[in-house]
Amino acid sequence: MKELQDIARLSDRFISVELVDESLFDWNVKLHQVDKDSVLWQDMKETNTEFILLNLTFPDNFPFSPPFMRVLSPRLENGYVLDGGAICMELLTPRGWSSAYTVEAVMRQFAASLVKGQGRICRKAGKSKKSFSRKEAEATFKSLVKTHEKYGWVTPPVSDG
């Protein structure tokens, strides 16, 4: 897959990719950088978090349909990351997706959204150790898409997280 080769050539080590069970359709992506002026970057430094780990699952008809993308770890709050690690971004929906998008571009947009939405690493006792689940992420994503199809996609104020 050309996408994988392009990411391997990135000079800024923004992201790195590992195939899950050697499948080209299932990637774990490490996001190594967010805005260094953000509270999320500060959280990452304070908690010795080297990266945000995401999982991308690609449909058979990629790039004509978006991948399913979710956060695996660390557990995040706000930043448009919802239950199960689901991500609230219109470009990850069939309506918002374009076959011209690259994984790198999607990851850069996600990094910007995390910061814009005031994403933080969860430090609440008990909750911070609880893993995100794929089943919960899929259900949450389905629900948020249905809600946005009904009411539209708007950019909420930053204070809404």
From Swiss-Prot:
Its EC number is 2.3.2.23. GO terms for biological process: protein polyubiquitination. It catalyses: S-ubiquitinyl-[E1 ubiquitin-activating enzyme]-L-cysteine + [E2 ubiquitin-conjugating enzyme]-L-cysteine = [E1 ubiquitin-activating enzyme]-L-cysteine + S-ubiquitinyl-[E2 ubiquitin-conjugating enzyme]-L-cysteine. Pathway: Protein modification; protein ubiquitination. SUPFAM superfamilies: UBC-like. It is an enzyme of class 2 (transferase). CDD domains: UBCc_UBE2Q. The active site is at C88. GO terms for cellular component: nucleoplasm; nucleus; plasma membrane. Residues 1-154 form the UBC core domain. Signal peptide: none annotated. The keyword Thylakoid does not apply. Keywords: ATP-binding, Chromosomal rearrangement, Nucleotide-binding, Nucleus, Transferase, Ubl conjugation pathway. The keyword Ribosomal protein does not apply. One of its GO terms (molecular function) is ATP binding. It is found in: Nucleus. Interacts with FBXW7. Probable E2 ubiquitin-protein ligase that catalyzes the covalent attachment of ubiquitin to target proteins. May facilitate the monoubiquitination and degradation of MTOR and CCNE1 through interaction with FBXW7. It is linked to A chromosomal aberration involving UBE2QL1 has been found in a sporadic case of renal cell carcinoma (RCC). Translocation t(5;19)(p15.3;q12). No gene is disrupted by the chromosome 19 breakpoint. Belongs to the ubiquitin-conjugating enzyme family. This is Ubiquitin-conjugating enzyme E2Q-like protein 1.
